[in-house]
């Protein structure tokens, strides 16, 4: 019995009931459409063609650090995801929840055919979170977010983190010589989790790190061209002017 069959055996009724409920009622997403973590969740919702209600949290005014938002996430960070009585924060936990509940709908974002494929998927999700994201997030902050707030980019930090990111991308280049995507030959949460920072960095000088590696460049071109991701980045359609459920 493979991993997916075991999960279904353990939670068959919960999963079916949960999926039906969400298709009817939709979800609530508290966040900011320009936030990398919020966009990560929106991308999964669009890949799964799911209904959701966007609720704007005004980061500029510090709304996320005050009540009532802190009652949703005591760490004061976006996004927060509401599914009835279930309230989740941490974007990667949210994406996995959605991908599992709706595993039979839309894009198959989990590779659970065997213990090995499940472990490989999990390994690459950890690599994204602990190897790629730290330097990528710092580079996004320095080159994209700070200028928005009128703050000066620290070029020393940029240089240091580009050097770290280069080492990560060298490993990615080698991996992508063997596989179309990072976890396997199909698009999964692993690739999706990279999208928010990559999208912002493509508008900065750091873009060169992705472009000078042929396999990485091809991978980036493919994942950033997905329709679900384009929708997640279109804040007018996916957030501000989105019809309420």
UniProtKB/Swiss-Prot annotation:
Family annotation (SUPFAM superfamilies): GST C-terminal domain-like, Thioredoxin-like
Enzyme class: transferase
Keyword Cytoplasm: yes
InterPro entries from the UniProt entry: Glutathione-S-Trfase_C-like, Glutathione-S-Trfase_C_sf, Glutathione_S-Trfase, Glutathione_S-Trfase_N, GST_C, GST_Phi_C, Thioredoxin-like_sf
Domain GST C-terminal: 114-244
Domain GST N-terminal: from-to ranges: 25-106
Any one GO MF annotation of this record: glutathione transferase activity
EC number of this enzyme: 2.5.1.18
Alphabetical GO biological process terms: toxin catabolic process
Major location category of this protein: cytoplasm
Pfam families: GST_C (PF00043), GST_N (PF02798)
Tree of life domain: Eukaryota
Reaction catalysis annotation: RX + glutathione = an S-substituted glutathione + a halide anion + H(+)
Family of the protein in this entry: Belongs to the GST superfamily. Phi family.
Function recorded in the entry: May be involved in the conjugation of reduced glutathione to a wide number of exogenous and endogenous hydrophobic electrophiles and have a detoxification role against certain herbicides.
This protein's name: Glutathione S-transferase F4
Organism of derivation: Arabidopsis thaliana (Mouse-ear cress)
Originating gene: GSTF4
């Amino acid at each position: 019995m493979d991993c997916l069959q075991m999960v279904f055996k353990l939670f068959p009724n919960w999963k079916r009931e949960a999926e039906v409920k969400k298709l009817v009622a939709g979800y609530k997403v508290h966040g900011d459409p320009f936030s990398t973590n919020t966009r990560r969740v929106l991308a999964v919702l669009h890949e799964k063609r799911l209904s959701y209600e966007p609720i704007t949290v005004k980061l500029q005014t510090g709304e996320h650090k005050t009540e009532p938002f802190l009652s949703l996430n005591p760490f004061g960070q976006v996004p927060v995801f509401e599914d009835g009585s279930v309230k989740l924060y941490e974007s990667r936990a949210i994406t996995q929840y959605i991908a599992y509940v709706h595993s039979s709908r839309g894009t198959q974002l989990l590779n659970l055919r065997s213990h090995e494929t499940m472990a490989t998927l999990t390994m690459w999700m950890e690599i994204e979170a602990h190897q790629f994201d730290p330097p990528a997030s710092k580079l996004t902050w320095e080159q994209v977010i700070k200028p928005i707030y009128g703050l000066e980019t620290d070029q020393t930090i940029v240089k240091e983190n580009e050097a770290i990111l280069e080492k990560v991308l060298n490993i990615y280049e080698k991996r992508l010589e063997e596989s179309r995507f990072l976890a396997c030959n199909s698009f999964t949460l692993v690739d999706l989790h990279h999208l928010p920072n990559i999208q912002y960095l493509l508008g900065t000088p750091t873009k060169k790190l992705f472009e000078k590696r042929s396999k990485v460049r091809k991978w980036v071109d493919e994942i950033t061209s997905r329709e679900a991701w384009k929708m997640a980045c279109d804040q007018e359609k996916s957030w501000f002017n989105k019809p309420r459920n």
